[in-house]
């Protein structure tokens, strides 16, 4: 996936930036096209260049995909295919004033938050206004892991987005330290912009 970037000198975090659409299209292409893979790279960039500043994570993740999907490499410690995917969003469920997110089996092993501030999560109500959210991991071992997301500013949430920005911030990964793919639970039309131009895009 395209790395995080900004055309401005200062680091700006824009949920309506067109790069969010690019990442979503890349994700959907991967999911519908045989013999393809998709590597997360937004966490390998910390500057305004569109090219990842840290090459090693991108190379390692790409090699994992090739070893697993092309050469059939196995993880000797698990007796299963070599893990190459980070957590992949599967479904959401509302629980009172919180939303619980589940991830595809096999991508969620060892699910954890790298940082205590759980950065990268946003939550919205029916007004479709997103607020920074708190998050924590539930379950594990014999119980499928999930992430619970909430915000005091959103008493009745209906949607969650994660790492949804031109410069995504994220903290969610699995036990192999592979980062979660950016995702959104909503299907609301998007209004990304490039410079001063606005576009409306339906999923």
Regions found by a protein language model. Name each.
Residues 23-120:
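Catalytic cores of secreted or luminal carbohydrate-active enzymes
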Residues 13, 42, 193-194:
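Conserved, single-site charged/polar hotspot
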Residues 2-7, 43-46:
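Solvent-exposed loop/turn segments at secondary-structure junctions
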Residues 13-14, 53, 133-138:
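Short, contiguous acidic/charged loop-to-helix segments that flank catalytic cores in large enzymes
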Residues 4-17:
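Serine-dependent acyl-ester chemistry module
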Residues 106-203:
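C-terminal beta-sandwich/jelly-roll accessory domains of carbohydrate-active enzymes
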């Amino acid at each position: 996936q395209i790395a995080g970037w900004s055309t401005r000198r200062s680091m700006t975090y824009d949920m309506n930036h067109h790069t969010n659409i690019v990442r979503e299209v890349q994700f959907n292409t991967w999911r519908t096209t045989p013999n393809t893979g998709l590597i997360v790279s937004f966490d390998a960039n910390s500057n305004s260049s569109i090219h990842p500043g840290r090459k090693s994570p991108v190379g390692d993740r790409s090699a994992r995909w090739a070893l697993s999907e092309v050469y059939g490499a196995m993880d000797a410690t698990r007796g299963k295919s070599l893990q190459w995917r980070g957590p992949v969003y599967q479904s959401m469920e509302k629980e009172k004033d919180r939303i619980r997110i589940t991830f595809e089996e096999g991508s969620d092993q060892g699910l954890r938050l790298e940082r205590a501030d759980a950065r990268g999560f946003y939550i919205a109500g029916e007004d479709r206004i997103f607020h920074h959210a708190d998050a924590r991991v539930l379950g594990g071992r014999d119980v499928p892991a999930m992430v619970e997301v909430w915000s005091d500013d959103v008493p009745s949430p209906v949607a969650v987005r994660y790492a949804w920005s031109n410069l995504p911030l994220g903290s969610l990964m699995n036990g192999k330290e592979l980062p979660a793919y950016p995702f959104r639970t909503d299907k609301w039309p998007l209004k990304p912009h490039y410079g001063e131009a606005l576009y409306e895009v339906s999923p």
